[in-house]
Every structure is written in structure tokens, then in C-alpha cells.
Design a protein with these regions (language model features):
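Alpha-helical hairpin
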Residues: 5-6, 34, 73
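Short, Lys/Arg-rich nucleic-acid/phosphate-binding segment
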Residues: 56-68
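Short alpha-helical segments that sit at the start of domains
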Residues: 1-13
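Short amphipathic alpha-helical interaction segments
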Residues: 33-49, 53-55
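Short, amphipathic alpha-helical interaction segments positioned at domain boundaries
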Residues: 66-88
Length: 88
């Protein structure tokens, strides 16, 4: 099992992503209260390592498009991410 370390902002974003159906960027912005630029950076970082996927699929997102996209947890990492979220 891969040992995953998450920052506080990554935890906040993952906490609000619906692990079954995904969550759109606008909802994440409202729930996390993170500035849009920072939220885009966190989402791009999570997508870069493969923990989060974006629908429709793309390698990264930007300020202009992230609000309409849906973000979901990559099922391949779901168990490891749940364990990482429980650790402090």
C-alpha cells in the first residue's frame, strides 16, 4: 500500500469531493473557501499525481474552466486516500 502524505489544502479539497459521483469546481470553491487561484493549483497538483480526475478528461484545469468541470477521486487510490485523510 502506498503511503500518501496530504497537505491541509489537499485534505480540504478531498473532503468535499463526492467520492461516488464527483463534485463540480463551483461547489468546491463554495465549500472549501479557498481562493480560486489556490484551488486551481491544488486541483492541478492532485490531478498531476493521479489522485483526482477531471470530467471531461484533461491533464490540468485553469481559472477560466474549472468551475464547469467535475472532479472525482481516482478509484485506484481511494483506499489509500481514505487512510491518509484519517491520519494527522
Amino acid at each position: 500500500m502506498k503511503h500518501i502524505k496530504l497537505s491541509g489544502r489537499e485534505r480540504a479539497v478531498l473532503r468535499y469531493i463526492d467520492w461516488a459521483t464527483g463534485t463540480n469546481g463551483d461547489e468546491l470553491l463554495d465549500c472549501t473557501k479557498i481562493e480560486p487561484e489556490d484551488l486551481v493549483d491544488v486541483l492541478n497538483g492532485l490531478m498531476e499525481v493521479g489522485y483526482v480526475e477531471m470530467m471531461p478528461y484533461a491533464e490540468h484545469t485553469d481559472l477560466d474552466t474549472f468551475r464547469e468541470k467535475t472532479f472525482e477521486v481516482n478509484p485506484s487510490y481511494a483506499l489509500e486516500l481514505r487512510a491518509a485523510m484519517q491520519r494527522l
